Amino acid sequence: MSTPAAPLDKDAARYAELDRRLVAAVRGVRLLESVSWPAAAQEKFLAGWRVGKLAMPVIEYRKHDFAAVREELAAVEKACDPAHPIGRYLHLTCESWRIATRLLDVVGTHRVTAFSTRLFGRPVEMLPGEGPTNLEAAMHFVELADELDQELSTYEPAYVLPAEQVQAELQEQIDGFFGVGEVKVELDPTLIAKAAASPTRIRLRTNTGFSEYDRNQLLMHEAYVHTLTGLNGRQQPVLGSLARGSPRTTATQEGLATLSEMMSG
């Protein structure tokens, strides 16, 4: 028999309600989905780039009205005490979502850079602990990856795995780790990236070839970082927003996912 959960204290109960309001307010804000190019535009751009004919596509970004979202975020933020640990967490999370909506207001214009910088930083900014810069750190890992690629190229099979095979193999491995039916691996013809993950679903781009190395990277990157983080957040009894994350956690999430690829080989 499971032990009943202890009742929340007054502060925790209040912040749990504010967190629920935050989650409800940003439910329709899809940052990556809103700024992604259509698959056809991406393919045309890359095809031109490969033959030295670089031409930027003209993208018609869908416009949204986020005024009500920002109003609710401001109300939640105002109700938080920034000196309280949960209050500070909600304050920073509301702020990052508000910046994200401002970015989406101006997507497709040069003004997007200012909001993107506030969310994700700049290449020349120093990492905590007196550096290096983001760019220098990235180049360091690129060099390590290049060395690894040279070693792996000797052993990497020349054949390409179809998306359907990778889907089946990943599903088997994921079922063995998370439990059967907990996380589904699906094919998506509209996906821009090769893969994307949520707490309960990992999508692979249809009609795309994968290498053996790709398959292993996907397991580490998508399943063991993004999906596992989301599932862990869902187990948090007070702050449901941890299941989704926020724009301010993107850099950490992607950094962990990329590092997991490299550490696992």
Where do the language-model regions lie?
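Generic, well-ordered alpha-helical scaffold segments in large soluble proteins
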Residues: 100, 169-176, 222, 226, ...
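N-terminal accessory/precursor segments of enzymes
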Residues: 228-235, 252
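Active-site recognition of the HExxH zinc-binding catalytic motif
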Residues: 216-231
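N-terminal low-structure segments adjacent to metalloprotease catalytic domains
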Residues: 1-135
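Contiguous, non-catalytic segments that form substrate-binding/exosite surfaces or channel walls
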Residues: 80-210
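Conserved structured core elements
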Residues: 91, 164, 217, 250-254
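Post-HExxH zinc-binding segment in Zn-dependent metallohydrolases
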Residues: 243-265
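Short helix/strand-bridging catalytic loops that position acidic/His residues to coordinate divalent metals
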Residues: 204-213, 236-248
